[in-house]
Amino acid sequence: MKNSAAREAFKGANHPAGMVSEEELKALVGGNDVNPETTPATTSSWTCITAGVTVSASLCPTTKCTSRC
């Protein structure tokens, strides 16, 4: 605003632009849901986990940490 009088008058105005209430923030992040935004482990997840453990066990022959692992 180039008009300094209008700019000064606007400074005193109570305008809520840009303000977000706590309820709105919770709604944005899923904080007011009964169940949070998570992904459960599915049947295909267990296949990947089992394969990862098997490959890891085959590469590291002992349970102790060594320079090979």
Swiss-Prot record:
GO molecular function terms noted in the UniProt entry: signaling receptor binding
InterPro entries per record: Lant_2_A2
Residue ranges of the propeptide: 1-37
GO cellular component, one term: Gram-positive-bacterium-type cell wall
Gene Ontology biological-process annotations: defense response to Gram-positive bacterium; killing of cells of another organism
Lineage: superkingdom: Bacteria
UniProt main location, coarse: secreted
Function field: Lanthionine-containing peptide antibiotic (lantibiotic) active on Gram-positive bacteria. The bactericidal activity of lantibiotics is based on depolarization of energized bacterial cytoplasmic membranes, initiated by the formation of aqueous transmembrane pores. When present individually, LchA2 exhibits activity towards L.lactis HP.
Name of the protein described by the UniProt record: Lantibiotic lichenicidin A2
Organism, scientific name: Bacillus licheniformis (strain ATCC 14580 / DSM 13 / JCM 2505 / CCUG 7422 / NBRC 12200 / NCIMB 9375 / NCTC 10341 / NRRL NRS-1264 / Gibson 46)
Gene: lanA2
